[in-house]
């Protein structure tokens, strides 16, 4: 599962890239979505790589994002009780592990908003005009996306 975080704004962005961002539900800066690893989403993420950071997320980080930034309709927080009542899992951590293994999906939580509004990273970005290979934060982070998401918790 990929975590995709929008890091750059929408001024002077080509129409096709902005349209792809809308399809990914990344309308604003510091918004995050989780998408499955399939060729369709991989192509979409590759198209917007100069405006987002993405990588493979682990269960611990997914649980942290769900707990801190997970919101239900009506802007209420996602809680352990809600997970227990509405899914087959006892905790957010157990649910996150099932999602990473592919046994479950984020859509299994009723009324969960698909977009996570993150905080700007503590201690700042390394630079939003450069890719990871050049010393910035844009593009493919692989496993290091977990570090960025922890900074943006």
UniProtKB/Swiss-Prot annotation:
It comes from the Archaea. Pfam families: Ribosomal_L30. InterPro entries: Ribo_uL30_ferredoxin-like_sf (IPR036919), Ribosomal_uL30 (IPR039699), Ribosomal_uL30_arc (IPR005997), Ribosomal_uL30_CS (IPR018038), Ribosomal_uL30_euk_arc (IPR035808), Ribosomal_uL30_ferredoxin-like (IPR016082). SUPFAM superfamilies: Ribosomal protein L30p/L7e. GO terms for biological process: maturation of LSU-rRNA from tricistronic rRNA transcript (SSU-rRNA, 5.8S rRNA, LSU-rRNA); translation. One of its GO terms (molecular function) is RNA binding. One of its GO terms (cellular component) is cytosolic large ribosomal subunit. Keywords: Ribonucleoprotein, Ribosomal protein. CDD domains: Ribosomal_L7_archeal_euk. Belongs to the universal ribosomal protein uL30 family. NCBIfam families: PRK06049.1, uL30_arch. Part of the 50S ribosomal subunit. PANTHER family: 60S RIBOSOMAL PROTEIN L7 (PTHR11524), LARGE RIBOSOMAL SUBUNIT PROTEIN UL30 (PTHR11524:SF16). This is Large ribosomal subunit protein uL30. The lineage of its organism: Archaea, Methanobacteriati, Methanobacteriota, Stenosarchaea group, Methanomicrobia.
